[in-house]
């Protein structure tokens, strides 16, 4: 493919992408395929001679699309949103064209410097404390990670290195192994599974703190666990507070948990993967109160801020906490500016070496939507979730299972877990909408998350009518079974 072909095929691909997204409502949201469907449709080996672009694009529609779950359909209400917007897609195209690997300032100065500035832009949109911003000579700063899971792991490993070095400095004969076997990290019992995985990878104990009636971690429960573990000779070193849990979008109490971590000299990491985008709206910023106590904070613009995956924003108050844990300088990566104090080498802030020019997506989206446009997008999703909540509350057969704060409604049929499992099976088997479940206080609960950029009130109403209809069929069938038994 030469430049002339690229121009022509590029226009065709943009047309295909735009047609796909604008017509996505007409596609079945959840695929009707079985595991292994794709292998028989594709040759067992790569072609010896080139295929044509026309054949490839036809195969996309014939082979790939039947197996796609359409996350951007207005009838997709599962998980949490994954962001999508035309400005971000255009920026991704440019990122692919530039094709730099921005592991250091010297490897691509614009890649590094735009990321630093965009993370400051975003931090100011969130009204983060000044300590988290890079500015021109700040001690903190932001970095784009691949996911919130990565950000949590990076924070845990940095905290682990910091406490090991501190204890070894106080007791020079102390081995790293002796410290590691006593380290304990903590998170709410509602925290994401990636927190547990970070503990496994980091080789430290992770303990779940029981949440309160609103599914939040509170000071009393955390303090009790800390005192118990310290009395047993263990060393608390790391706490993850979640703002907007995956199960029900609950919020740990930072204003209670933060001071405890500060007093105990425990690293506090705040994970707001989904909810963080909402903090650009003044009416939701109070949910972030207490972040001033945190050592690190992250959320995913690639969930709800119209910046395509992957783009997970992470800030730290002290960049030396990261560089102190991860810095390695082989001669082939060194450059003449690294000791100047004027630049950032982001390879020292992350687990991989290589990194894409991801800040281009932020730059395009922030400029083409503006803060007001992004705020309007968030507010619309929140409004739609409250519309669905109202539908549920009006039907005496159903109940809302957790407070609706942002774009997620947790609900269920009043009755057994089996009844709700059967309802979810009917919903997803019909393939008109797509939902996933969670468990709250041991109960099987359905989650309705507002996800698509194109979702409107009409889609929410149709989804609710569909759920109500399937519930009526299910309840009638259950009633019939009961009559037969009696």
From Swiss-Prot:
Q: Which residues form a coiled coil?
A: none
Show the Pfam families listed in the entry.
Pyridoxal_deC
Gene giving rise to this polypeptide: DDC
Q: Where is this region: 2 X approximate tandem repeats?
A: 58-178
Q: Mind listing the GO molecular function terms for this protein?
A: 5-hydroxy-L-tryptophan decarboxylase activity; aromatic-L-amino-acid decarboxylase activity; L-dopa decarboxylase activity; pyridoxal phosphate binding
Q: Does the keyword Metal-binding apply?
A: no
Q: Does the keyword rRNA-binding apply?
A: no
Assembly information from the UniProt record: Homodimer.
Q: Name the top EC class.
A: lyase
Which pathway does UniProt place it in? Catecholamine biosynthesis; dopamine biosynthesis; dopamine from L-tyrosine: step 2/2
Give the reaction(s) catalysed.
Answer: L-dopa + H(+) = dopamine + CO2; 5-hydroxy-L-tryptophan + H(+) = serotonin + CO2
This chain belongs to the protein called Aromatic-L-amino-acid decarboxylase
Biological process GO annotation list? amino acid metabolic process; carboxylic acid metabolic process; catecholamine metabolic process; dopamine biosynthetic process; serotonin biosynthetic process
Modified residue annotations for N6-(pyridoxal phosphate)lysine: 303
Q: Which family does it belong to?
A: Belongs to the group II decarboxylase family.
Under InterPro entries, the record lists:
Aromatic_deC, PyrdxlP-dep_de-COase, PyrdxlP-dep_Trfase, PyrdxlP-dep_Trfase_major, PyrdxlP-dep_Trfase_small, Pyridoxal-P_BS
- Its source organism is Sus scrofa (Pig)
Which PANTHER family does the record associate with it?
A: AROMATIC-L-AMINO-ACID DECARBOXYLASE, GROUP II PYRIDOXAL-5-PHOSPHATE DECARBOXYLASE
